Regions:
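Acidic (Asp/Glu)-rich catalytic clusters
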Residues: 46-49, 76-83, 129-136, 221-222, ...
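Active-site-facing alpha/beta catalytic cores
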Residues: 2-6, 85-240, 244-245, 267-268, ...
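Internal helix-turn-beta structural module
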Residues: 303-346
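N- or domain-start disorder-to-order transition segments that initiate the globular core
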Residues: 5-46
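Conserved phosphate/anionic-ligand binding catalytic regions in large, soluble enzymes, centered on
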Residues: 54-67, 325
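Conserved, mostly hydrophobic/aromatic
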Residues: 58, 263, 329
Length: 348
């Protein structure tokens, strides 16, 4: 009989189960309390109950645990400095959606060479999340598929659904199941309506299929996630200006949704010129000083060193520099946080 299935696949390895990985890297009671408490603080900000600003900041993607931990340690000092005005959360992205092809992140390819040691990548990701949370820094990530979230979601305080997947039904269903607040980015063309539709969908109960913690394919019923929100990330043109924020809030109001959102300083809003994140920051700070309550949070891409680098076989990487989108350096990060905290003073 002719084979009609698995004609274009080759098995690489057996995947570890979420339960097995969690047993190797368990969550302590103190970390569990930290994650729970940080989620509650973020929820209050998104509901307008807390006038502080959510700040999701960090490298475009994680590729070096040592550099990531150095960044996290410095970020914790900034958290303590600005805690009265800012709820700072570290961006810890392990999966990268690609427009065509490219490195897909630490979980898929931790060795950066196409060897796809996924079990090792999952181990590194969970280990880093534990260490960052143990420092007292909450973590944020993008949920890209139905499987990998089962390995790390218990350590995530804020999640994102990316511009390429906001319109996807299965991602909306997954968001309705997640235990953390979830932001939906507007489409790559700048369309914010798809993000509003995603918020509405994720607030509802859904049935969806996913592996459970033991790897058994399972039928889940979700209760819905009441903390979905828009991430304004720009598109063909930036959408961080006051009129863009007002238009998005009008759409939210139309559907009786909370008129609070997050502005991404990077991506379409900086037109892929990373230093423009500082210009976006200045504009957002002015909007906050002018009395805007719609801006509940911001996202920014920063690392220890400025810019980005390419992976070149046989050549060492520059420590603390991104291998995906270009980032601001640490000095600019401190300036950005100082400006945001000063602007939020006007809310008190």
């Amino acid at each position: 009989m002719n084979r009609t299935d698995e004609l274009r696949t080759a098995r690489i390895d057996i995947l570890v189960t979420p339960t097995e990985l969690a047993q190797r890297y368990p969550v302590s009671s103190s970390v569990a309390s930290h994650v729970t408490d940080s989620r509650r603080r973020i929820e209050k900000i998104l509901n307008g109950e807390d006038p502080r600003l959510l700040v999701v900041i960090g490298p475009c993607s994680i590729h070096d645990l040592n550099a990531a931990m150095e960044y996290a340690t410095q970020l914790q000092a900034q958290r303590q400095k600005h805690q009265a005005r800012l709820e700072i959360v570290m961006r810890t992205y392990f999966e990268k959606p690609r427009t065509v092809v490219g490195w897909k992140g630490l979980i898929s390819d931790p060795d950066l060479n196409g060897s796809y040691r996924v079990n090792y990548g999952l181990e590194l990701a969970r280990r880093l999340l534990l260490q960052v949370n143990e420092l007292g820094v909450p973590t944020a990530t993008e949920f890209l598929d139905m499987v990998t979230g089962q390995f790390i979601a218990d350590l995530i305080s804020w999640g994102a659904i990316g511009a390429r997947t906001t319109e996807s039904q299965i991602h909306r269903e997954m968001a309705s199941a997640l235990s953390c607040p979830v932001g939906f980015k507007n489409g790559t063309d700048g369309n914010t309506r798809i993000a509003v539709d995603a918020i509405r969908a994720s607030r509802a109960s859904h049935m969806f299929l996913s592996p459970d913690k033991d790897g058994q394919m399972t039928i889940y019923q979700t209760s819905g996630n009441p903390y979905g929100h828009i991430i304004m990330r720009g598109g063909k043109k930036p959408n961080y200006h006051a009129e863009d924020i007002a238009a998005a809030c009008d759409t939210l109001h139309e559907f009786d949704l909370p008129e609070h959102l997050v502005v991404d300083f990077s991506h379409g809003n900086c037109q892929k010129q990373h230093r423009r994140q500082l210009e976006v920051c200045d504009d957002i700070c002015q909007q906050i000083r002018n009395g805007s309550t719609a801006i509940a949070g911001i996202m920014a891409e920063s690392f220890l060193r400025e810019g980005t680098q390419k992976i070149i076989s046989g050549q060492p990487l520059i420590y603390g520099q991104s291998i995906t989108d270009p980032c601001l350096n640490w000095e600019d990060t401190e300036v950005l946080l100082e400006k945001l905290a000063a602007a939020v003073d006007s809310r008190f």
